[in-house]
Regions:
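Short substrate-entry loop that stabilizes the transition state in hydrolases
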Residues: 1-35, 76, 88-89, 179
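Catalytic nucleophile-loop/oxyanion-hole region of alpha/beta-hydrolase
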Residues: 4-9, 25-63, 216-217
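Alpha-helical scaffolding within the catalytic cores
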Residues: 6-12, 91-95, 153-161, 194
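Extracytoplasmic/secreted proteins, especially bacterial periplasmic and envelope-associated proteins
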Residues: 10, 14-17, 40, 44-47, ...
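Loop/turn elements at helix/coil->beta-strand transitions in domains of secreted/extracellular proteins
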Residues: 18-23, 63-65, 101-105, 165-170, ...
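C-terminal catalytic histidine-bearing segment of alpha/beta-hydrolase fold enzymes
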Residues: 35, 169-184, 190-232
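Primarily recognizes the serine-hydrolase "nucleophile elbow" in alpha/beta-hydrolase
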Residues: 47-123
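Mobile cap/lid helix-loop segments that gate and shape the active-site cleft of serine hydrolases
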Residues: 84-87, 117-161, 167, 188
Length: 232
């Protein structure tokens, strides 16, 4: 993805009319320069969020009300930001790194909600995504090495980071879930969403799951969800 495509994940014009500032970012894709490779995009997102907060006064932004939106891998990154414990370093010499990395909400489309291959194949038998996050290809190798990389999975999988103090999230998918069944698009299946929603609710975290002809939700799109939670 690219920040030039942000209107695919939330409507910037509607957000601006609602008095909500919009910042779009690019980040590195998974790279061998970091260990594990997924650390690159995720920590780029953290740094961007902290940088925005460091500019709050200059940019006229309320840094206590910031949400994230994204699609696919960007959706996974947004959820990770929403669920991960605060990565601020109050004692850092870098003022940017002293800023909190916590969000007030996240609204995403087509998110991969776990980076645990065991969960993936249990939810969706023809899963094939995620090994690149840890430098393991193909998926079979990813699954075989799961035990060795469990500490990484616990650190970088959104699902593994959910705790009761996390902000509300909104998940949007194109098709209804069917747990345990082969999916036409296993990388963007709403099976990811249903299982995360169950996990969020079990931990007391508000989570809306929207897909066509699904159960009624308070919001039907990412933009309206962001407005609701950022205008509070």
């Amino acid at each position: 993805g690219s920040k030039e495509r942000l209107n695919r994940f939330a409507d910037p014009n509607i957000l601006l009319k609602a008095g909500i500032s919009v910042v779009a970012i690019n980040y590195r894709y998974v790279t061998d320069d970091e260990t594990p490779p997924v650390k690159a995009p995720l920590h780029d997102a953290v740094r961007a969020l902290q940088f925005i907060r460091s500019k709050a006064k200059e940019w006229n932004i309320d840094k206590t009300r910031i949400g994230a939106a994204g699609g696919s891998a960007g959706a996974c990154s947004s959820l990770w930001l929403a669920f991960h414990d605060d990565l601020a370093n109050p004692k850092s010499k870098d003022p940017v790194l002293r800023e909190t990395s916590r969000l007030q909400c996240a609204a995403v489309i087509g998110a991969q909600t776990t980076l645990d291959p065991k969960q993936m194949v249990e939810w969706t038998p023809n899963s094939k995504y995620g090994g690149h996050a840890f430098g393991l290809h193909p998926f079979d190798k990813f699954l075989e090495n799961r035990q060795k990389i469990l500490p990484w999975i616990k650190e970088y999988s959104p699902y593994a980071n959910v705790t009761k103090d996390d902000p509300p999230v909104f998940l949007e998918y194109k098709t209804p879930p069917a747990i345990g069944e082969v999916q036409r698009d296993p990388t963007h299946t709403s099976n990811f969403g249903l299982k995360l929603q169950e996990h969020c609710h079990a931990n007391g975290v508000p989570c809306e799951l929207y897909y066509p002809n699904g159960p009624k939700t308070k919001h039907q799109d990412t933009t309206s969800f962001l407005i609701t939670h950022l205008q509070k």
